[in-house]
A protein has these predicted regions:
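N-terminal Rossmann-like or analogous alpha/beta NTP/dinucleotide-binding catalytic cores
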Residues: 2-139, 257, 296-298, 302, ...
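Internal, conserved structured core segments that host functional sites
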Residues: 113-115, 119-169, 173, 194-195
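Conserved nucleotide- and phosphate/pyrophosphate-binding catalytic cores
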Residues: 157, 163-353
Length: 353
């Protein structure tokens, strides 16, 4: 069986470091591993419209921003198909068929949907498209026969929902769809990077992000304002590492060579944590170190992004070509699904059989 990846992002804003450590970095590694036959990376504009229907211009303007971020982190269009979701209409038809296999009560139990409904204040007025987007995601995944979906842990309920749809479809109509597996980041700190304000999720809508395209002075300003341990009032006070975003970011980004270059009095992160926990280490010092680490990590990404910004017609062509390949693949899957449901009425005069 072919090994195929499907992953993507909603174009509601530029991508941030939470995206980077949660999935983008892993996508580049997988892309270059040679272990996968096909890789599809989707700019999920249709899904973004489920809670931005009154502002489609916001979605439209961010399609190129997300594409630029992909290319900046190292996604290679020669190895991965970058495409726009709404340019593959077969996904909508697949979603429509899958809706008949899922109950309202099952959608209501999805913890990711429940959390996002609360965050977006949709409790009393949930758009139907938003409520059913886990079904749309299942269509996205199955249309490309994805075997692997690299994603953060917050997407695990979505993958479970998708696997249920695949199972039911295969039982009711015959073996047609491929059951996917989620691939989580190996570094626990990367599973879900908190916002700079200490909130559980880094989110564009909460304004607590460090963007991949941020300028150096903006990154420094955000890091120096980061939430830390509220009980660590004086340098000599013992500090808490658990739940401290500065150390969570260091877990995700720092490497031994960073200590040798920027903070040679410590050999590694464990030594730095131990000093902070016993007292005598101030927040400003660890924030300055984090700033140095993140500047080193993000500078080459920012440079590549600026280079691609000078080649926008080429970026559009990459999206066109990727979308054409994606539509061809999705059309083949849709044909198989229609055949399994026996609704391919005009193929070989099937309506007469």
């Amino acid at each position: 069986m072919k090994q195929i990846i499907l992953t993507g992002d909603r174009p509601t804003g530029r991508l941030h470091v939470g995206h980077y450590v949660g999935s983008l970095k892993e996508r580049v590694r997988l892309q270059n591993s040679g272990k996968f036959d096909e890789i599809y990376i989707m700019i999920a504009d249709a899904q973004a419209l489920t809670d931005n229907a009154d502002n489609p211009e916001k979605v439209r303007q961010n399609i190129l921003q997300v594409a630029l971020d992909y290319l900046a982190v190292g996604i290679d269009p020669a190895k991965a198909h970058i495409f726009i979701q709404s340019m593959v209409p077969e996904l909508t038809e697949l979603s429509f068929y899958y809706m008949n296999l899922v109950t309202v009560s099952r959608l209501q139990r999805n913890p990711t949907v429940k959390a996002e409904i609360q965050q977006k204040n949709f409790e009393t007025s949930i758009p139907v498209g938003f409520f059913t987007y886990p079904i749309s995601q299942a269509a996205d995944i199955t249309a490309f026969r994805a075997t692997t979906v690299p994603a953060g842990e917050d997407q695990m309920p979505m993958l479970e929902q998708c696997r249920e749809i695949v199972h039911k479809c295969n039982v009711v109509y015959g073996e047609t769809l491929t059951e996917p597996e989620i691939l989580l980041p190996s570094n626990h700190a990367c599973l879900r990077l908190p916002g700079i304000d200490g909130k559980a999720k880094m989110s564009k809508s909460l304004g607590n992000c460090i963007y991949l395209s941020d300028e150096p002075e903006d990154i420094k300003k955000k890091i120096m304002s980061m939430y830390t341990d509220p009980g660590h009032l004086r340098v000599q006070d013992p500090g808490k590492v658990e739940g401290n975003p500065v150390f969570t970011y260091l877990d995700a980004f720092s490497r031994p060579e960073h200590f040798a270059e920027f903070l040679p009095e410590y050999q590694n992160l464990d030594e730095l944590k131990a000093h902070y926990q016993r007292g005598g280490l101030g927040d400003v010092k660890i924030k300055k170190f984090l700033n140095a680490v993140m500047q080193a990590e993000l500078e080459p990404i920012r440079t590549r992004r600026k280079e691609w910004e000078q080649r926008l017609p080429e970026v559009v062509e990459i999206l066109k070509e990727g979308s054409a390949v994606a539509e061809q693949t999705a059309a083949a899957t849709l044909a198989d699904v229609r055949k399994s449901m026996r609704i391919d009425y005009f193929t070989d005069n099937n309506l007469l059989k």
